């Protein structure tokens, strides 16, 4: 990910497991842009912030236990109430890229 302009504001938010995540927000409108979950090497970009979000489709839906009940999820995409075992779902090439960034031991979690 390359930040082209601006200076997003980090906001620490507690997680269910007692750790924290850092959500980076636009300092003007406070919209969430991306998150870090304890590892600044890996950022999770919010789909709605992309220039063309409709060209990216989700591979998985996570934390569905907190979704609004009127939100319907397609049966064709795996859904999990909490997180999931990425080794069971991610393509080998994606896991290899994560290993290259974090190291094999760290990316196993």
Predicted regions and their residues:
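A short Gly-Trp-Pro
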Residues: 1-109
């Amino acid at each position: 990910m390359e930040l082209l302009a601006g200076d997003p504001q980090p906001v620490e938010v507690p997680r269910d497991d007692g750790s924290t995540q850092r959500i980076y927000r636009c300092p003007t409108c406070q919209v969430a842009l991306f998150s870090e979950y304890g590892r600044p090497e890996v950022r999770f970009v919010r789909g709605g912030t992309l220039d063309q979000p409709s060209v990216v489709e989700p591979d998985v839906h996570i934390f569905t236990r907190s979704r609004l009940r009127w939100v319907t999820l397609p049966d064709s995409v795996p859904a999990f109430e909490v997180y999931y075992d990425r080794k069971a779902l991610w393509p080998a090439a994606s896991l290899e890229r994560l290993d290259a960034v974090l190291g094999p031991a760290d990316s196993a979690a």
